[in-house]
Structures are given as structure tokens and as C-alpha cells.
Amino acid sequence: MALNDCFLLNLEVDHFMHCNISSHSADLPVNDDWSHPGILYVIPAVYGVIILIGLIGNITLIKIFCTVKSMRNVPNLFISSLALGDLLLLITCAPVDASRYLADRWLFGRIGCKLIPFIQLTSVGVSVFTLTALSADRYKAIVRPMDIQASHALMKICLKAAFIWIISMLLAIPEAVFSDLHPFHEESTNQTFISCAPYPHSNELHPKIHSMASFLVFYVIPLSIISVYYYFIAKNLIQSAYNLPVEGNIHVKKQIESRKRLAKTVLVFVGLFAFCWLPNHVIYLYRSYHYSEVDTSMLHFVTSICARLLAFTNSCVNPFALYLLSKSFRKQFNTQLLCCQPGLIIRSHSTGRSTTCMTSLKSTNPSVATFSLINGNICHERYV
């Protein structure tokens, strides 16, 4: 087998596909430890762990939102939509990715070749656009609280979440259109392997445009918008800390701390997404601009696998980051998994008024309004 025939490059899934798993079928110029079939079985096992952990976390998160009425607020709806997108990716794309290390050909036919890339890009779009919407929601709650509309707020957010899904699917349509099966003939054994490629019949310009457009639309532009939102959020929180009014000081401090916690949670989600998907985008760009070459170095092979696994890991870490950052979600998570009774929600009452302090993703009653004094302005809001 020729050197360039050892691995088949698939730009869509960003990793190498072994043309022949058995180390006895060819004299491969790689380390025997890595070419041993047992090593290739470890990779699908890692995929299996990621899928299992992701299923547990995301299904539990969605179940909490669906079954616990008090948890159905604006941020939680966005986070549930995020979990649904991650769940879709883990159920469909992750097993397909893992199968490439166990088989030497594409197993899912022409329909699967068009459907899997479509689902994958839809899920990525849902993730990054939902994070952008969450950041915008935190910006509005902290910087422009007077703009919050209490009436039909949850319904409006449902429509926004649905719009994000529609936009993500529309942007993923080209993946389904251009992806197709591609025959790969190995002259030494006179065998033909079938692979799934996003643009099997195009020139070198197409992958360059595709990789750069994906990097900009699904990474750079959304994260830039999020950065602008968080600049103004940080600026407002710093100003609020120095401009607290004398009256109602304790209540305002509590509300600022509440919003800081939720803003921190969203920022952690954004950071995890940026960290997990950057290597995948970088490798995709590298391959697209070296489309006519096949890098068969072990460093590139290992880096590609790690980048791919890291990208799928992003679909399972959010529920557990939420578990660590939110006491209320941690309580509900333990209730769902350990079948224990949730604790009572304690509200503080004073003469002639009742105040509910809403914390990060904390259970709230939509019928209870909260009056706040932020930067000297009295605002009325129902969702934080």
C-alpha cells in the first residue's frame, strides 16, 4: 500500500479513516503500538463513555425542565434547547464517528452520508446560536432591565428557540446537498472502499470556502457578539457595585449577585464551547488549505482524534458544569438520579410585602414579580 493510501482524509468529520485496520495487511510506516487493532478499539470505547455521560446529563436536564414547573424560566428554556441539540449530536453523529475506527468502509449508505453531516452542523448551530441568545438575555436582564416584558415572556423565548433551530437547519442544508459517497480504489489489493465526503467532486477552492465559512459563521462571529455582550455586562456590574443606593442595599446586592452567578454560568458554557471546538476548526482549516496533500504523520493522526473527541465532549459537559455552578439544579439533579425528595423552597416575608430572591437558575414562581433598584432606576421584571 502506498504511503498516501494508508489513511483516507475526510474533511467533514475531521479525522483520518483507516483503510485497513489490520497491521498485517500492509507495511505501514507507523509505530506498531498505534497500528495495533487493540488501540483502535480504545477510541470507540472513549466515544461510548462520552455518549453515555452525555445521555445521562442531557436527558436529566431536559426532564427537569419538563417535569419541574418552577424551573421553567427563560434561561432554563434556552439551556434545555442547548441540551436537546447536544443530545441529537450524541445519538446520531457520535456513534457514526466511532464506527469509522471499527470498519474500513462507510456503513450508512447515501442517505446517511447526507443526513449525518446535516444533523452535525445543525447541532453545532443550535449550540453556538443558543449561547449567543443566552448572552443577549443576560445583557438585557443586567444592562437593560427596563426593557424586560413580563407578559408572554416564556412564549416569546420558545419562539426564539424554535427560530434558532430553523436557522441552524437552513444553514446545514448545503451539507446534505454536497455530501456524497466517494469510491476509493486501493491498487495493491484491487479493493474499492466507499467513504462519505462533503464535496467529493469539487476542486480545491470549495473546501477552502467551506472551512472558512464554517469557522466564521459557527465560531468567530457568534463568539465575537458574545464578547461584546459580556463587555457591557461586566462594565454594568462594576458600575452597580460602586453605585448602590443606601435604601434597599441588601436586596440590590442579592439581585446583583444572582445575576452575576447566572452570567458566570453562561460564560462558562461559552468558554467550554470555544475550548472544545477550536482545535476541530483549526485542523479543518489546515486540511482544507492542504487539500491535495495527505498528512500521514502520527502527530497529525493523534491530534485529529483528540480534536474530534474534544468536540463531542462539549455535548456532555454542560449539564455537569451546571451541576457545579447551580445549587438549585444540583438539588433537582440529585432528586432525579437519587430519587430523593426535593427540599422546600424558602421565601422571605416581611410586613406588607413578599420578596422572592431569584438566584442562578433557581426555582421561581412566574406569578411573583420582583421589584429592583438598579443604578437608581426602579424596574419590574418577572424573569431573571
From Swiss-Prot:
The modification Phosphoserine is found at residue 350. GO terms for cellular component: plasma membrane. Glycans are attached at residue 20. Its main location: membrane. GO terms for biological process: G protein-coupled receptor signaling pathway; learning or memory; motor behavior; phospholipase C-activating G protein-coupled receptor signaling pathway; positive regulation of behavioral fear response; positive regulation of respiratory gaseous exchange; psychomotor behavior; regulation of cell population proliferation. It is a multi-pass membrane protein. The chain crosses the membrane at residues 39-62, 77-96, 115-136, 153-174, 209-234, 265-285, 299-325. A lipid is attached at residue 339 (S-palmitoyl cysteine). Residues 63-76, 137-152, 235-264, 326-384 are cytoplasmic. It comes from the Eukaryota. CDD domains: 7tmA_GRPR. One of its GO terms (molecular function) is G protein-coupled peptide receptor activity. Residues 1-38, 97-114, 175-208, 286-298 are extracellular. Pfam families: 7tm_1 (PF00001). Highly expressed in pancreas. Also expressed in stomach, adrenal cortex and brain. In brain, expressed in cells throughout the cortex. Disulfide bonds join 113-196. Keywords: Cell membrane, Disulfide bond, G-protein coupled receptor, Glycoprotein, Lipoprotein, Membrane, Palmitate, Phosphoprotein, Receptor, Transducer, Transmembrane, Transmembrane helix. InterPro entries: Bombsn_rcpt-like (IPR001556), Gastrin_pep_rcpt (IPR001966), GPCR_Rhodpsn (IPR000276), GPCR_Rhodpsn_7TM (IPR017452). Belongs to the G-protein coupled receptor 1 family. Receptor for gastrin-releasing peptide (GRP). Signals via association with G proteins that activate a phosphatidylinositol-calcium second messenger system, resulting in Akt phosphorylation. Contributes to the regulation of food intake. Contributes to the perception of prurient stimuli and transmission of itch signals in the spinal cord that promote scratching behavior, but does not play a role in the perception of pain. Contributes primarily to nonhistaminergic itch sensation. PANTHER family: GASTRIN-RELEASING PEPTIDE RECEPTOR, LEUCOKININ RECEPTOR-RELATED. This is Gastrin-releasing peptide receptor. It comes from Homo sapiens. The gene is GRPR.
